[in-house]
A protein has these predicted regions:
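Bacterial Sec-dependent N-terminal signal peptides
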Residues: 1-21
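GH16 jelly-roll
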Residues: 21-258
Length: 258
């Protein structure tokens, strides 16, 4: 596990019993004036030349100006200027990477048609093995063209990267306010929750790199795409600018009885 930034130093300023209970691997509350560059990287551009449209025919250009911290929240804005769509994307590659844990993210969705906010993870070895060999864990995906639906998915070499290990769940008030998205990532399964309600558990038939490439370090990505294969061709420009808010991220070690 790579922890160049010592998040566990939090335990030094807490009482020992609280540390033992929480077993925090990583915690980010965005309570600062600027993005913590010891934790995060900006991703910018349109993915070209190697991954134009970010591999999904997305319309946006990522620019760090569309990532902000406001009132203790991470805010990613999607906007159209002239003929160009802009949005923001950050990742924790080479800075915060870990294997297994209970991941909780509190977020408020952008809901315009054509928008695609997401909180997800990629295998830290993606530069060496490529995708989908790296594996992908989609903790939250939402698309404005399917209101009231949350997507939780996994991508593996066995699925050839296709979204077959997935669950679409109808949640009546998902567009209203903040909700807590959780993934329990273990050596045997990955399970997804929203506001404490279990949505989907993925358990492979075989625990090999083809079917379960999830026994290694992964890193976070947070972004909002515009259009694309999942976001859809129709974009409601009257809904822009629209904002995707993330209140906090917390990762704790698996409980002994997971």
């Amino acid at each position: 596990m790579k922890r160049p930034y010592s998040f566990l130093i939090l335990c030094l300023v807490m009482v020992s019993t609280a540390c033992a209970q929480d077993k925090i691997i990583f915690e980010e509350d965005f309570n600062s004036d600027t993005l913590n560059m010891e934790v995060w990287n900006y991703e910018e551009g349109d993915g070209c030349p190697n991954l134009c449209g970010w591999g999904n025919n997305e319309k946006q250009i990522y620019n760090r100006d569309y990532v902000a911290l406001e009132d203790g929240k991470l805010v990613i804005t999607a906007e159209k200027k002239a003929d160009t769509y802009y949005s923001g994307k950050i990742n924790s590659k080479d800075k915060v990477e870990f294997t297994y844990g209970v991941i909780e993210v509190k977020a408020k969705l952008a809901t315009g048609k054509g928008l695609w906010p997401a909180i997800w993870m990629l295998g830290a070895d993606i530069s060496e093995v490529g995708w989908p060999a790296s594996g992908e864990i989609d903790i939250l995906e939402y698309i404005g063209r399917e209101p009231g639906i949350v997507f939780t998915s996994l991508h593996t070499p066995a699925s050839h990267g296709n979204t077959i290990n997935t669950k679409k769940t109808k949640i009546a008030d998902i567009e209203e306010g903040y909700h807590t998205y959780k993934a329990v990532w273990t050596p045997e399964y990955i399970e997804f929750f929203v506001d404490g309600k279990q949505l989907y558990r993925f358990t492979p038939e075989n625990y090999n790199e083809e079917e379960y490439p999830f026994k290694k370090d992964f890193y976070f990505l947070i972004n909002m795409a515009v259009g694309g294969n999942l976001g859809g061709a129709e974009i409601d420009e009257s809904a822009l600018p629209d904002k995707f808010y993330v209140d906090h991220i917390k990762v704790t070690e698996l409980p002994e009885d997971y």
